[in-house]
């Protein structure tokens, strides 16, 4: 039996505190963090370090120069694209196959994912339900919700 691998992918993140908070979630859950360049901040940023606290040594961070580079490196990965344009809620998908690597791909805080990526992958676009008067949820909160939904479906494998 394999351990299910979870991955959070941040496409050109802009806010260091969000990335730091997501890194902390990744450290707590053995989830790999992928950062797609260019980043909107320096990896030496004080807010990034503070949000991640002293857990950075426990985070597996992988840098990519493009989404295409990521897709090429993980051809067998199962990619899900998080967008308010998704037709299905995050709970509609099954994350329990022990032979899969699950990638949750998030867009920039201000503009989301590239439109053509969304249009070409609508069957794998998911959304978090929310009221009409809210434009979006915070990126780090959304990432945590997705990671913990996958872990819930896996009965919180290897977590105490």
Swiss-Prot record:
Localization per Swiss-Prot or TrEMBL: Cytoplasm
Pfam families: SpoU_methylase
GO terms for biological process, alphabetical: wobble position ribose methylation
Task performed by this protein: Could methylate the ribose at the nucleotide 34 wobble position in tRNA.
GO cellular component, one term: cytoplasm
Highest classification ranks of the organism: Bacteria, Bacillati, Bacillota, Bacilli, Bacillales
GO MF terms held by the record: RNA binding; tRNA (5-carboxymethylaminomethyluridine(34)-2'-O)-methyltransferase activity; tRNA (cytidine(34)-2'-O)-methyltransferase activity
SUPFAM superfamilies for the chain: alpha/beta knot (SSF75217)
Keywords: Cytoplasm, Methyltransferase, S-adenosyl-L-methionine, Transferase, tRNA processing
Domain of life: Bacteria
Enzyme class, spelled out: transferase
Entry binding sites for S-adenosyl-L-methionine: 82, 107, 128, 136
Protein name according to UniProt: Putative tRNA (cytidine(34)-2'-O)-methyltransferase
PANTHER family given in the database record: TRNA (CYTIDINE(34)-2'-O)-METHYLTRANSFERASE
Predominant subcellular localization, coarse grouping: cytoplasm
Family as reported in the entry's similarity comment: Belongs to the class IV-like SAM-binding methyltransferase superfamily. RNA methyltransferase TrmH family. TrmL subfamily.
